Amino acid sequence: MYDGPAIIRVNDADHGARVRLTGHLDPIDGRYHWRGMVSDCALDPTLRLPQQVSVSIEGRTSQGQLTEMTPWGTHCVAGVGMPPYPVG
């Protein structure tokens, strides 16, 4: 699990954010699935979702997707493969 600062890249623009991410190794497909919340991020409120993004944490970058916006203005993010935070 990771809870801290990150850079969210959307449409070639970087946005500072706070993320709370967790994940698991899926026994069916054998891949690591990670997901979580993005907050404190000044994304365009008219951004169409789902939206491809990259999430960078301390030099590690992973591709993911913003899947929805919550009623509180945060965004859900999900990805498959190596997460942007250390697993261990």
Annotate each PLM feature:
Residues 10-12, 23-27, 40-42, 59, ...:
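Beta-strand elements of well-folded, non-transmembrane domains
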Residues 54-88:
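Short, compact, well-ordered microdomains
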Residues 25-33, 67-74:
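Short, ordered beta-strand-loop transition motifs
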Residues 29, 45-48, 65, 87:
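Short acidic, gly/pro-rich beta-turn/loop elements at beta-sheet edges
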Residues 1-29:
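Solvent-exposed edge beta-strands and adjacent loop segments
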Residues 30-44:
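Charged, amphipathic alpha-helical segments
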